[in-house]
């Protein structure tokens, strides 16, 4: 059940972020909910990859997704842990990008 809810939440985030105008968007579920080890208390680990983040610092990126993040929390009554990447950052060999790729099961 935890995986189904998380996948619904990812779809919700993706739809809302597209409506908000984020370009070249990928929303990737990772962590325990992606790998099947989640409990009902687990958060939803999500990576958002978008070219709209290009040239933006962490705080600007957070502002860009803030309203959608709040909507998702209210809709699913779950905590979300969100990491944000440009496509180039996500495809890089950085520790955080490698972690997300591994924890997504890909």
Regions found by a protein language model. Name each.
Residues 1-28, 35-40, 51-106:
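Catalytic core of pol beta-like nucleotidyltransferases
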Residues 45-48:
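Short beta-strand->loop micro-motif that forms the acidic, two-metal-ion catalytic signature
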């Amino acid at each position: 059940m935890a995986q189904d809810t998380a996948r619904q939440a990812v779809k919700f985030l993706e739809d809302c972020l597209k409506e908000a105008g984020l370009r070249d968007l990928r929303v990737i579920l990772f962590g325990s909910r992606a790998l099947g080890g989640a409990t009902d208390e687990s958060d939803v680990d999500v990576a958002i990859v978008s070219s709209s983040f290009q040239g933006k610092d962490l705080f600007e990126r957070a502002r860009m997704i803030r309203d959608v993040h709040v909507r998702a929390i209210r809709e699913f009554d779950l905590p979300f842990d969100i990491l944000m990447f440009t496509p180039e950052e996500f495809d890089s060999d950085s520790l955080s990008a490698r972690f997300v790729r591994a924890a997504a099961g890909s």
